[in-house]
């Protein structure tokens, strides 16, 4: 699912981006762990000011789940998405909470500037021409800048839990959201990204604690994971 069909799919879910127990509730519950990873990596490569005034591009931003906490932490955030309805939902929610975020319904190729940080979370598993997409992502990053990706590993566990469990049994995710064949093992994703002048600098699992009922960083990589890259500084 990519391009117009993907945009239409998420257009139909636009009213659920900020709904309690809606179609994106899993992303909301995962978000504190994802933001923690982002903060840690940004503080490593931008130790002086961290996220404050950092120019950030969030690709596949949806309703703004990642953009909003980054903006609250002081970043100058642009979010892009192919779904016009998702962008409208993102703008409305940001306006409601008086957040200054630039949301645009456009493709990655239409972005003509570069950023300190590019995030693309839970997106690459929906992309058909992945190598071309990754190449475009890397073009939007300044030398020395950072790219952060998160996605699902292609394992038996991710099929049983991520698709059969989440989509068909628990119904936490709409049926048809994921195609297991598009899930990527970490080494596959890293090898694609590193072809385009990037270096993997951090890889962590994203796991769910049934006891604490929350997502956390660390542990196994058998389902969700998040990986950070730095654009190589030329000698």
Identify the meaning behind each predicted range:
Residues 151, 171-188:
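Acceptor-substrate binding/catalytic loop of class I
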Residues 29-52:
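Conserved alpha-helix/loop element of class I SAM-dependent methyltransferases that forms part
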Residues 158-168:
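Short, flexible, mixed-charge acidic loops at enzyme active sites
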Residues 45-159, 186, 227-231:
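Conserved SAM-binding loop
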Residues 181-196, 203:
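Short alpha-helix
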Residues 214-235:
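Core SAM-dependent methyltransferase catalytic element
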Residues 15, 19-21, 26-31, 40:
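Class I (Rossmann-like) S-adenosyl-L-methionine-dependent methyltransferase catalytic domain
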Residues 1-20:
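N-terminal, positively charged/glycine-rich alpha-helical extensions of SAM-dependent methyltransferases
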């Amino acid at each position: 699912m990519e391009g117009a069909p993907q945009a239409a799919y998420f257009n139909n879910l636009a009213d659920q981006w900020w709904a309690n127990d809606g179609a994106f509730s899993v992303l909301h519950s995962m978000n504190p762990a994802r933001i923690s990873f982002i903060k840690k990596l940004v503080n490593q490569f931008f130790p002086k000011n961290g996220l404050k005034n950092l120019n950030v591009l969030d690709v596949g931003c949806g309703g703004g789940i990642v953009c909003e906490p980054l903006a609250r932490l002081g970043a100058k955030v642009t979010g892009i998405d192919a779904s016009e309805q998702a962008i409208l939902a993102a703008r409305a929610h940001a306006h409601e909470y008086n957040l200054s975020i630039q949301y645009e319904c456009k493709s990655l190729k239409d972005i003509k500037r570069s950023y300190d940080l590019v995030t693309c979370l839970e997106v690459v598993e929906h992309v058909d021409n992945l190598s071309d997409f990754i190449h475009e992502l890397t073009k939007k990053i300044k030398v020395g800048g950072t790219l952060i990706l998160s996605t699902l590993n292609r394992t038996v566990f991710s099929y049983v839990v991520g698709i059969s469990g989440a989509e068909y049994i628990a119904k936490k995710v709409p049926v048809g959201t994921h195609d297991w064949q598009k899930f990527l093992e970490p080494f596959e994703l890293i090898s694609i990204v590193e072809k385009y002048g990037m270096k993997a600098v951090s890889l962590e699992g994203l796991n769910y604690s049934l006891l604490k009922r929350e997502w956390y960083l660390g542990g196994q990589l058998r389902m969700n994971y998040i990986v950070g890259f730095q654009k190589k500084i030329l000698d």
